[in-house]
Regions:
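Outer-membrane beta-barrel "beta-signal"
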Residues: 247-254, 271-289
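Flexible, glycine/proline-enriched loop segments at strand-loop-helix junctions
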Residues: 147-151
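Detector for outer-membrane/organellar transmembrane beta-barrel domains
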Residues: 153-229
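Structural signature of outer-membrane beta-barrel domains
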Residues: 57-59, 89-93, 138-144, 185-191, ...
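Transmembrane beta-barrel domains of Gram-negative outer membranes and organellar outer membranes
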Residues: 20-141, 155-169, 213-246
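Bacterial Sec-dependent N-terminal signal peptides
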Residues: 1-23
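Conserved active-site loop/cleft motifs that coordinate metal ions or position small ligands
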Residues: 215-218, 248, 256-263
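Residue-level signature of outer-membrane beta-barrel architecture
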Residues: 73-75, 121-123, 166-168, 206-210, ...
């Protein structure tokens, strides 16, 4: 019995020491672990909207392919909605160097992703001299099954953010609308030994187009505090302040939006992303109260 207790104590100490070397950040995990949150054009749809996407991340010793599913249900059309999304069937392949650097257990494999649940509330309707303002409250579940592969965190997280958007009508045929969107918020996630990493979120988006097409350019990121701590980050490489740039082209054909996106990790997000997808409304799934 005494021998068993000693072995158990040694095992727990080893696990604690091992866990403390894990950096819960975008620099040390797969691209879907804790990405920079996306934000919309500061509008809530009138009908339930489904989006289906395929992503390819590459560069810096990690190649990742995955599906992506998103659904937004307007509980009160254009005022309140519930949104759910998740990565689907992630397949990855890394170099041996990246595997060793992250402390991962495998260079390749497949994973299921985290599930996000978000409520969206319109605080202010867009008017001539006022922007629309949307409040988002988001919960990230720890749905992924395997932590040792360093694809997803084994801890939950949450964030709150405000989207503010305003359009200008140009009366042109090729470009009939210019819309500017700003995003500010606060993100929090749990790390080693219940230590919380807190981060202000920020972003800006410029959208141009007409009813048939639109082009979005987005710069966004968040700024975690753990990389600033000399005690918790003595090697100064925690990497929890990602900044990304994305450009997205959408073509509208009937009720279906077809889109393609390229995203570049400027800081603490060592990936390029290519995304293609479709988005469409489903009237029969729209709640009617």
């Amino acid at each position: 019995m005494k021998k068993t207790a000693i072995l158990l104590l040694v095992f727990l100490c080893q696990q604690a020491n091992y866990a403390q070397t894990t950096k819960y950040s975008t620099s040390w995990f797969g691209p879907n672990a804790n990405p920079v949150p996306e934000f919309t054009d500061a509008r809530i749809p009138s009908k339930t909207t489904v989006s289906l996407m395929a992503d390819y991340y590459f560069g810096y010793g990690d190649q990742t392919k995955n599906g992506y599913f998103k659904i937004e249900l307007p509980l009160l059309p254009e005022r309140v909605s519930l949104k759910i999304w998740s990565t689907v069937l992630e397949h990855y392949k890394t170099t041996a160097e990246i595997m060793q650097k992250r402390g991962s257990s495998s260079v390749s494999g497949s994973e299921g992703g985290d599930i996000y649940v978000q409520t969206r509330i319109r605080l202010l309707k867009e008017q001539t001299n006022l922007p629309s303002i949307i409040l988002n409250s988001t919960l990230k579940t720890a749905s992924a099954k395997t932590f040792k592969t360093r694809r997803y965190f084994d801890t939950p997280g949450y964030y709150f953010d405000l989207e503010m958007g305003k359009s200008i009508a140009t009366r042109g045929k090729f470009i009939s609308e210019i819309r500017a969107v700003a995003n500010v918020g606060f993100m929090c996630w749990e790390t080693t030994n219940s230590t919380q990493d807190d981060a202000p979120m920020y972003g800006g988006k410029l959208i141009i187009g007409n009813p048939k097409w639109k082009l979005e350019n987005t710069l966004s990121g968040y700024w975690g505090w753990l990389h600033t701590s000399t005690r918790l980050n003595p090697t100064a490489d925690y990497g929890d302040a990602p900044l990304v740039y994305a450009t997205k082209l959408t073509l509208v054909m009937g009720n279906i939006d077809y889109f393609a996106q390229y995203q570049y990790g400027i800081h603490d997000f060592p990936y390029h992303q290519l995304r293609v997808g479709i988005s469409f409304p489903i009237s029969k799934l729209t709640p009617k109260f």
